[in-house]
Amino acid sequence: MPKVNENSFKKIEKDVLKLLPPRPHKIEISEGQKFAKSIRQALSKYVTSVNHPIDFFSNQMLDVPFRQPLYADFLIQAKTIHQKEPIGSFLFTFKQEDSGSSIDIIFSPVSFYKISGLDAEFAPSVHRISFVWYGADNCIEDTVPNLAELIEEGKFHQFLTPVGPLVENITSTFVTRIKSVVKGEVLNNKSPPENVKLLLPSDLFIDLDEPNIDTLAPKHLLSFYYACVTYPVLHNVPVMALTFIKSNKSIRDLFCHLKVIYSDIIRTKYIAMQNDFYINKMSFGALCKLGSSSSETVPRRGNYHFRGSSLPTVEVPDFVADPGPWMTIL
């Protein structure tokens, strides 16, 4: 007796059954109650029941969806952003001219410090980790050939654009692909999306918001975060510094506060440049808005560890990226 192929038999059986008309449903039409019951029985074979209909509608229809962030992808040289750069670090892209190249130049707070010309006195922890990640064998300084000229003339920030917190870093031997949130809530690209905290070096962070006190004065709903690039003179050599500032004050009050903070540094720079001073060097720096968070949010302090080195950080859990233009500080 020949052996029957079970799969072939099931396929033939299925094809034959398709040729038969479907079994009819018995519907009672003589009485209204019996008609409704028979209709429900017929429909129950084709639909699924919802055990908690109220929860179903509230979860699927009433919950407010998150605001979709705007992502940006960049291809960069592998060594210009270290593979251990923490997720949440704020990034800047640098471009002097549109050369048509698909390779971008990206700076993090740590890599920016490495090319700034500052010593360990200004930010000890950032200085230490910058040499661990971007040491003497790194080519990060070569990405900007006229770096010294831009710093001396106070023009580096003119080619610098904030592109938001880092949310993905895919490293390879030669080219690295990174993703950042340019605008909107800082969420990663997973499904479902997860919140990413803004991470800033505490050595480079200044909180200008007054401590919470009992007062009848109205409070601002948001605190804004800014990047401040300045061009001081260190040991008669022009350098630049990147500082992150948190403030819920108006722009006018913020600039007045910055003039007080940097008054001695500005005076020292102008004294050092009095023999080589002209109008193009009058700019001391520039300020740029990066985004905001709730005014009730207090940035948390943390530490990022790497091979025995520790980088004190400031974490902002509800940061929303919304960068603005650079504003000159004279």
From Swiss-Prot:
GO terms for cellular component: host cell nucleus; viral capsid. Pfam families: Herpes_VP19C. One of its GO terms (biological process) is viral capsid assembly. Coiled coil: none annotated. Keywords: Capsid protein, Host nucleus, Virion. Disulfide bonds: none annotated. It comes from the Viruses. InterPro entries: Herpes_1. Transmembrane segments: none annotated. It is found in: Virion; Host nucleus. GO terms for molecular function: DNA binding. Belongs to the herpesviridae TRX1 protein family. Structural component of the T=16 icosahedral capsid. The capsid is composed of pentamers and hexamers of major capsid protein/MCP, which are linked together by heterotrimers called triplexes. These triplexes are formed by a single molecule of triplex protein 1/TRX1 and two copies of triplex protein 2/TRX2. Additionally, TRX1 is required for efficient transport of TRX2 to the nucleus, which is the site of capsid assembly. Interacts with TRX2, MCP and capsid vertex component 2/CVC2. This is Triplex capsid protein 1. It comes from Saimiriine herpesvirus 2 (strain 11) (SaHV-2).
